[in-house]
Amino acid sequence: MRAIALYSTLFVLIAGALVIVAIHGGTNYAREFVDGYEHSIVRPSKEQQEHEPAAHTTGWTFSHRTQGRNYGLTEEQCNVAFPHLYREIDRAVQHRKDKWGNITPDELETAWRGDGIVRAQIHDNQLYIIDAHGVVDHNHRPRTVATLHSLHRAISAFQGKLPDIEFTFTVHDAALPDSNGNETTWAYTRREHQEKLWLMPDFGLWGWPDVGLRSFAELQEVLEHEEDEFVDKEPKLVWRGSVAVGSKDVRHGLVDHSKGKSWSDVQTLDWANSTNIQERLLSMQDHCSYMFVAQTEGNTYSGRLKYLLNCHSVLFSHDLEWLELYHHLMKKSGPDQNYIRVKRDFSDLASTMDRFSRPANYLQAQKIADNARRTFRERYLTPAAEACYWRAMIRGWSEVQDFQPEFWEEVTEYDKVKKKEVQKRKPRGAPFESYAIMEEVDWQLPAKARKMCIDE
């Protein structure tokens, strides 16, 4: 498929060059035409080359083809491969040092969040779940399971020693029940003023199977081998989503300003209507078959953004109020531009799309798509980068942790051998290996593991 598309493109270029020769009476103009195309889609600018990570001191360099799913990179390799990944961690650490001081055990209480919060610790490179608070419903459960698996993978793949820490994380769209709350926890997203929150990798970087995304790594693999060349994609802007969410303004704006346009494939979804879903829902691979993809925030952040950035397509996005750990890598202008910023109400969408949907501007559009693929799919959104981020977050948290986590707890148990009550020590919580099966911190024997699907 790719070979045919490539030869077709080359044929069109050569034919165009011959026509230009005939019209302009010379070869220089035609050569400039072909050279201009080659340079615009293949060779990064001098500034882009300068932004490439430096080589490892032993000569090691990162390649997404061979290292993209290497979950056990050393700390030095992580810094070489992903030098601009850790801004949110550095910010959170510095904020504690400048304003709040070190993290205390009192800040790890979970009662402030009614549900969807987990307390855990890492001891001797082992993940333990201390309290899984209200995470068994259809929304919180898959997020919790995915996040714990992702964190465990990053820990277990690493051959070095990680610091012992104790922490909490929430799996809500909005970590804080009060937008102006002051709690400290790990979260998927935050607003600019919520500076005590520490941003962790989103659960969707593991997988989101309940909406058809079986594995993030699998999506990247499929796109690497099956995605159409940019020039062969559907030259339209695609979006699917419900308007019954928190960010109604941006979604209604997108729908209103794309209605009836020849370049638009924007359609709303009604999740309560199975016929509507069957007719309109698109897979992420389907989204990547379009030249242009639209991003909107949802109840808070949008879980689809990281997937759309894997497409070799041009992303259109409004300014984002909810931050994720990689948002600072999105460039709206300059030689490294990797998406197109539109107004929050999408009022400038029509004029922008009228420009980029013209075939004469496909080369400029493709350069933006090239930059996005190079930055995200081939580097900063690889599974290897996610694992590196987790470990950097563990190190950063330990830097401002004001206590040594207690691994052991004293309990009174009946000793069947001594036939009396005795004082014993046991680890706090449950090791990940058992929690992954039981989804409980404690259980009675004979045990019964939680069912995979629960009707509510």
Locate each region found by the language model:
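Catalytic binding pocket for nucleotide-activated donors in carbohydrate/polymer assembly enzymes
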Residues: 287-456
